[in-house]
């Protein structure tokens, strides 16, 4: 049930804090947690974004294999968030630099003899 997952994800945050962030009243958010109502798709997506989980996780408790799995490292999460504000040119440069580092790393690994 989505309510239990929302309660667990909320942790020490208040219902008011989360409700404000996703644009619903505290009472409405409370209804989601208590199973009295289900969020619509847009609200579900906002909740998933806020908690940094997939909508699949919120709905089923299971995360299908997704790009989110690649971001378990906090440093990578931060880098990804920072890149969201980059211009298209800067994003392209970042991608090219990452590809350069990937090639460099591949060439550093010792080959099996």
Curated annotation (Swiss-Prot):
It comes from the Bacteria. Coiled coil: none annotated. Residues 6-58 form the HTH cro/C1-type domain. The defective prophage of Bacillus subtilis 168, PBSX, is a chromosomally based element which encodes a non-infectious phage-like particle with bactericidal activity. PBSX is induced by agents which elicit the SOS response. Pfam families: HTH_3 (PF01381). Changing residue 19 to V: In temperature-sensitive allele. It comes from Bacillus subtilis (strain 168). Repressor of PBSX. Binds to four sites close to its own gene. Necessary for the maintenance of the lysogenic state. Residues 15-34 bind DNA. The lineage of its organism: Bacteria, Bacillati, Bacillota, Bacilli, Bacillales. SUPFAM superfamilies: lambda repressor-like DNA-binding domains. InterPro entries: Cro/C1-type_HTH (IPR001387), Lambda_DNA-bd_dom_sf (IPR010982). Keywords: DNA-binding, Repressor, Transcription, Transcription regulation. This is HTH-type transcriptional regulator Xre. The gene is xre. GO terms for molecular function: DNA binding.
